[in-house]
Amino acid sequence: MSVPTPHAALLSEIPIREHEVEVLGSSTHYWEYGPKDAEHTIVIAHGYRGDHHGFEPVIARMPQLRIIGPDLPGFGSSTPMTEASHNIDGYRRWLAGFIEALGLPTPPVVLGHSFGSMVATRAIAEGMPARALILVNPIATDPKIGAGVGITRLTRAFYGASRGLPRPLANALLRNWLVVQFMSMTLVTTDDPTLRTWIHEEHHRFFNGYSDPRTVADGFEASLEAEVGKAAPGVGVPTLLVAGENDTITPLDGQFRTVELFPDARLVVIPKVGHLIHYETPDAAATAILEFLDELA
């Protein structure tokens, strides 16, 4: 029996509209939350092998904002790009094209979560207009070593093996229940048994929502390209980093180093949580985001 979604009641009170737009050959599906006339509009770039659902626990706690959450190309309901590679440069080009296609009257606040933090930071550093930048669980340490060299090599071999298999076998490997469960168990830090169960169920629901094995393998290679600090000096907008005290994917010492690389940035550390801030501490994440937005001139 499934665990009820903790934020379902809050989310049900927010108007949600689904749209579709083509960007770099990707039929990109996106969801628009909240009032169209909100003071702030946020565009979200989600994490690796996730989709727009992932940040909904936080979105549900910010009903006053207009939030636009696309599925990145090749994940969720969005098809892969045909006019760009599925690397950080390709995804940053897609993000810039997506925001341009929205036709917003003013540049939005851009929020990057985990993998999306690299995409968003790189896009803004290379000239994409934005009002501000918010990074949740940002990749602030070299991703090849952040989680441990051994684990990274093993994971890289896993995705590399999927490339050489026929599609049905590759999908069977990538979507194996034990593989997804192991990944989920390594990320969860909460002691709340009900919340832990719900998070595992969420990963099983959405972690396998990718278009094809090659795109998901390309995405993993993209996730190893660079930490956000490489592009940080080129970000000329106010920036908020929201990090987990116990994040093993991108440890806290890297966050303290990285925040100093941005021209105008602050760091909020949420205690007793790891790489799943959006699932485990959505109230704290929403508070940090809203306080940051309130201080924007």
Residue ranges and their predicted role:
Residues 246-250:
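Acidic catalytic loop of the alpha/beta-hydrolase fold
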Residues 26-79:
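Conserved HGGG/HGGXW glycine-rich cap/lid loop of the alpha/beta-hydrolase fold
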Residues 265-297:
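Catalytic active-site module of serine/aspartate enzymes centered on a nucleophile-bearing elbow/loop
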Residues 117-128, 133:
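Short glycine-enriched nucleophile-adjacent loop
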Residues 132-167:
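Flexible "cap/lid" loop of the alpha/beta hydrolase fold
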Residues 235, 241-243:
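Short beta-strand/loop motif that positions the catalytic acidic residue
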Residues 168-234:
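Conserved alpha/beta-hydrolase catalytic His-Asp/Glu region
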Residues 23, 31, 69-115, 126, ...:
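Active-site loop/oxyanion-hole signature of alpha/beta-hydrolase fold enzymes
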